[in-house]
């Protein structure tokens, strides 16, 4: 292992003791101070962000994720304040029992320890991760992408300056160099890192899962479907589909495939009408193509190929699949889903119940946009990632997901027979 990286990880592990000694009220004050510092230095953050943006083509799908403007920074500041004001997740009593032999047994929440997060493009993640880890008593190792190097480095400087003002050990957070070659060393850091969370492309997530010797929670990649049922309301459908697809195409909760009941194909042109205003390219199956031909801009309509389904576009592109019934819709989702976010638009309660019960995803929606799959929108303040697995955490991961528990047993000299 690279000596410098090894030293950083050892220092981070050692710093867990110092972090555990910081009282909850102090952690809250420090986070509020960080929020104020971020707000104070908005122009400097934008300047550093522009350095990163200048090295990327504006047409690159990552460009929007990399961009930090005043509005996004203020939203980030607000998220930090929300996290600061959340209840302390540590020391929560999950179970308590007095045994017949006099033993008192409790199960209480504790930090996970050292959390490494590997992420791409989005520098706002740097602040989200630190605020959640700090509030939950976890040391964080940040491994951002080279495309956000200037922005991440400046954000880390603001974090460390805030900690120094409170005489806090700054080893509780570190930003590793962006070189990809260092990733394997991090993934092999058994005994130093307690959990790794990859946030980014499917290729990144696959690499981490396949090469890690430390525990991993998979997050990110979203192959998202919305099913418009036979009973779907046209007005709701138009708004939901447009929002889920075009609000922010570069995020993991953006719509990738619209599934439509065959009996509602006549309404398809109206359902997707507003998408043409955003130049959304539609990859339509045979039935959908036949209906949209002459009813959607010719240059934006393409006959779908098999590979267009089960694809995370992260762009102004949408696949459309026609099905004869809700069972076929669910079967299609189960075949291609990444188990992130899936939605149904329906008025028939039995159809809604069937969809919400049978679809296997971290977040399932009825008559709402999948754009809501987000820690802030779920009342978590922020998120460290959106887990697409079932063990330990699932869906947006807030403070609770960053804790484990330990058993505390008090006795008066008891021994076991």
From Swiss-Prot:
Subcellular location: Cytoplasm
GO cellular component: cytoplasm
UniProt-listed Enzyme Commission number(s): 1.2.1.41
Superkingdom assignment: Bacteria
Keyword hit for Amino-acid biosynthesis: yes
One Gene Ontology term from the biological process aspect of the record: L-proline biosynthetic process
Keywords: Amino-acid biosynthesis, Cytoplasm, NADP, Oxidoreductase, Proline biosynthesis
Reactions accelerated catalytically: L-glutamate 5-semialdehyde + phosphate + NADP(+) = L-glutamyl 5-phosphate + NADPH + H(+)
Keyword NADP: yes
Pathway: Amino-acid biosynthesis; L-proline biosynthesis; L-glutamate 5-semialdehyde from L-glutamate: step 2/2
InterPro entries cross-referenced by the UniProt entry: Ald_DH/histidinol_DH, Ald_DH_C, Ald_DH_N, G-glutamylP_reductase_CS, Glu-5-SA_DH, GPR_dom
Major place of residence: cytoplasm
SUPFAM superfamilies reported for this sequence: ALDH-like
An example Gene Ontology molecular-function term: NADP binding
Function: Catalyzes the NADPH-dependent reduction of L-glutamate 5-phosphate into L-glutamate 5-semialdehyde and phosphate. The product spontaneously undergoes cyclization to form 1-pyrroline-5-carboxylate.
Membership in a protein family: Belongs to the gamma-glutamyl phosphate reductase family.
Protein name: Gamma-glutamyl phosphate reductase
Organism: Legionella pneumophila subsp. pneumophila (strain Philadelphia 1 / ATCC 33152 / DSM 7513)
Gene responsible for this protein: proA
